[in-house]
A protein has these predicted regions:
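Substrate-engagement module of ASCE P-loop NTPases
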Residues: 158-169
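P-loop NTPase nucleotide-binding core
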Residues: 22, 26-153, 167-169, 177-179
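Conserved small helical "lid"/interfacial subdomain of P-loop NTPases
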Residues: 199-227, 236-244
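N-terminal pre-P-loop "Q-motif" helix
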Residues: 12-24
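Amphipathic alpha-helical "lid/sensor" segments that cap RecA-like P-loop NTPase cores
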Residues: 224-269
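Conserved adenine-nucleotide phosphate-binding loops and their immediately adjacent elements
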Residues: 1-14
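Short, conserved phosphate/pyrophosphate- and ester-handling motifs at nucleotide-, phospho-/glycolipid
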Residues: 17, 46, 237
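Short regulatory helix/loop adjacent to the ATP-binding pocket of P-loop NTPases
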Residues: 179-194
Length: 269
């Protein structure tokens, strides 16, 4: 119910961000348009992306591929799962063909046959040709983890290629950043086809909605002062609202009480 440590992926647990969800759906349903969602850590980017993506695949009948990036990822590995849908496995770099025989001192013979994917998969235009006809949404989360600026630039270049051809393959990029340029490596012409959405902190009303929704499911009651205390401590970050509410609820359940007041919140902290 209160999930501070994992992004929300169930619609019935998601609260707030109605405007942003509608904005994302409208953009991804627009021909040639893709989405870049960015903002501070803890504002709920991944949860919003999960819910918006889930809604889109229901509305548009698209397949969903999710890639959560790590520091070891590169341009090619970002699209590995999407390419698998085309029957292309870039993890197979080569195969060895070996035989064993002996004729007058001539022994084992071995040759290597290269598939050639590893060079091609570095090219945005090659990736584009393989993916352009897929009716798929690729959600690229934690894109800020990508270390190489050239890899980020290639992703932006691929998005432009997809946009120019009005491809049904859509890309939804999510990452921690102060500006969109940090995630696109300053690609000069991607702005017209990549809707940039900066996710700001949540309003107090949205944070209270998180508390009310969770407490109703747990059959607990947070007092008015307790809610305002949690909101003040959260400073607009839903991560902290979930965390403090979770710890307060755990304390109430342990103590076998249903009402949570400001003292219980302070004790949970």
């Amino acid at each position: 119910v209160f999930t501070p440590h994992t992004p929300i992926n169930q619609e019935n647990l998601f609260r707030g961000r109605i405007t942003e969800v509608q904005q994302i759906l409208s953009t991804l349903n627009t021909p040639g348009q893709h989405v870049l969602l960015f903002g501070d850590r803890g504002v709920g980017k991944s949860s919003l992306a999960n819910i918006a993506s889930s809604k889109l695949i229901k509305i548009a009948g698209k397949d969903l591929v999710i890639k959560r990036c790590s520091k070891s990822d590169s341009f090619s590995t970002i699209f590995e799962s999407a390419l698998m849908k085309c029957g292309i496995d870039i993890s197979i770099q080569s195969k060895n063909i070996s035989g064993s025989f002996s004729i007058k001192g001539i022994g084992c013979q071995e040759s290597t046959e290269y598939n050639g994917f590893m060079d091609k998969v570095q090219s945005p235009s090659w990736i584009y040709e393989k993916l352009k006809d897929l009716n798929t949404l690729l959600l690229i989360d934690e894109f800020d983890s990508i270390q190489n600026k050239e890899d980020k630039h290639k992703v932006a270049e691929l998005i432009k290629l997809l946009s120019d051809s009005n491809s049904s393959f859509k890309i939804f990029v999510v990452g921690i950043a102060e500006s969109a340029e940090e995630l696109t490596a300053g690609h000069p012409s991607v702005q017209r086809c990549l809707k940039e959405i900066k996710l700001s902190k949540m309003s107090q009303r949205e944070l209270v909605d998180i508390i009310n929704s969770g407490s109703a499911k747990l059959k607990l009651n947070f007092t008015r002062d307790a809610k305002f205390r949690i909101c003040r401590l959260s400073s607009g970050y839903p991560h902290f609202t979930h965390l403090i509410s979770l710890k307060s609820a755990e304390g109430a359940i342990i103590n076998e009480v249903t009402d949570i007041d400001i003292d219980d919140v302070n004790e949970a902290i």
